[in-house]
Amino acid sequence: MCAIAGIIGQLAEFQQKVHLASILAAMTHRGPDSTDIEILENHGCFGHNRLSIIDLNERAKQPMWDYSQRFCLSFNGEIYNFQSLKKELRQLGHQFRTQSDSEVLIEAWAEWGIASINRLVGMFAFAVWDRKDKQLYLVRDRMGEKPLYFSSIKQNFTNGLVFASELKGLIKYPFVKKSLSMTALSHYLSFNYTSTDDAIFEGIHKLPPAAYLHYNLNTHQYCVKEYWSLAESFHDKLAISFDDATAELNYLLAESVNGQVLADVPLGAFLSGGIDSAAVVSHMRRNNLKQVNTYSIGFKEKTYNELPLSQKTAQHLGVNHQAKIVFPPISHLLPKLISSFDEPFADTSLIPTYLLCDFAKKHVTVSLSGDGGDELFGGYITYQADRYHQFMQHLPIATRKMLLKLSHYLPTSFNKISWDYKIKQFLRGSLLDFKSAHTSWREIFNPDQKKLLWPEWVEHNSKDWFNDVADCHYLDQAMYVDMKTWLVDDILVKVDRVSMAHSLEVRTPFLDHRLVQFAARMPISYKIHNRQSKCILRASHARYLPPAVLRQPKKGFNSPISYWLSNELFELAYEVTTSQQLTTWFNKSAIEKMWYEHRNSLYDNGHRLFNLLCLGLWCQSYL
């Protein structure tokens, strides 16, 4: 994995190199092996920090020109089908100097131009400069695994565009201003993350997944276009038997894993107690690898520890498994961890994911993960909530309101499976329409709570993704929306930032676009049937995995944050959440009330207090 950056515009060569060097220095963790800058005549420059994965030779460094010297590439990611593309390009007369997928990518661009994107299987964010036509292209992979930020330049009669893999790099450019977006802040308070459509600083943009940006230096205009549509697959349902679908799923996942185990450095996999990572590891085991190395961590708090199941899976599959219980010095770790994120972020699973990456990096440079399985096959409990929501609509609204009031008498629990929290969240959602209810399942501060906290709060900007699949089954709608929001802006951001903080490349076989398309096209009953989730994934791996794993419901990879906030994290959290930095915006008495309720076990405010804590720590690093 790597960091890419570039400046396109009429600046002096010296200025370009100085500014770009500063941007790259802020992203060294993404590519610690080498740093290079390529001057694009007097039109700008490309930069690259390299984490060597395939072809470790110096000749494979970037930025890289194609053989004709017309196109220059700066590339972050992996092209898993580069070998078959290379064979095709050789037949068309292309010559190669390296064994890297980067060279295959730039030669593919030289041959097919923008149409080459549709031939790629992989995760990527890359930039191409066309020397002849003075055009810049920025491209991001279909599912949004790799990040890319950009901003227009309009300063001192200079027009142009600057881009970088991470916002922490982009803001090192002196003409990029750090003006906080209140709509992005509002979205963060609601969901623990900012959206693709609205970066935390005004004037900075995130290139959406499955899109490319075309910038014309002659006109100083750019446009962003989509090159792949996930919604089309949800509309194009397959007429296929369950047995045939099971066989096809096994084939596609095997193909994906086979493409992703290629590396010239040590490779392993994350292994939790769930079926997703177990399925990936089972295919690695069948790939005839000499040895499969897997890694897990757990907490001392019993309900947050899945190590016994991961160890059972590892023993069943015969892999070399390493696991440990972690005792994180959370008050010292969290500020450093939050600073590794470009924007405010408060998913509590960031802590165990960070610790897992730290553990795995001691042994490998590349790790496969099971991320994406829940979105593809309906693994989240929120989809069961969607089903029950349909039933609840048959009850009078007065009955639903009464049930919500009664739920506040439930005793508060700080366990991982905190049913009192889930029941209260569900009953509030039962009063809403389906779209609003599905969104509310993951809300941290609902509108009423946000109003008490932030009297001058503003509505956040959110695209209504439901409209793309309005005529599909309601559970298909929910899964599509989650892939366009939760997966892109929470799960994949978390995995990218914490893995890159350790210079570890994480690959996600479930997000191979061919597998994603197939999952979207299959009947919803193959994914969720009655109270069973991931039906087809469980059936397709019944021969390979232990029964305990096949029966295991979704638990998640969360932290005991509610417990920590009442104990070892309290001092730091209270100081940060009641600091002037936050109380300038927010009502301090509302924050004090949340602390009183939480500390006295009157209400589990763990997620809301952690949201404010992470925001405050982010402000200390970036404002």
Predicted regions and their residues:
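Generic hydrophobic alpha-helical membrane-span motif
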Residues: 37, 147-150, 279-282, 376, ...
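Short low-complexity, flexible loop/linker segments enriched in glycine and/or proline
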Residues: 336-340, 383-385, 564-566
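Cysteine-centered catalytic environments shared across enzyme families
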Residues: 1-341, 353, 357, 543, ...
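Flexible, active-site-proximal loop/turn residues at the rims of small-molecule/cofactor binding pockets
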Residues: 11, 373, 619
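Short beta-alpha connecting loops at secondary-structure transitions
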Residues: 170, 296-297, 343, 387-395
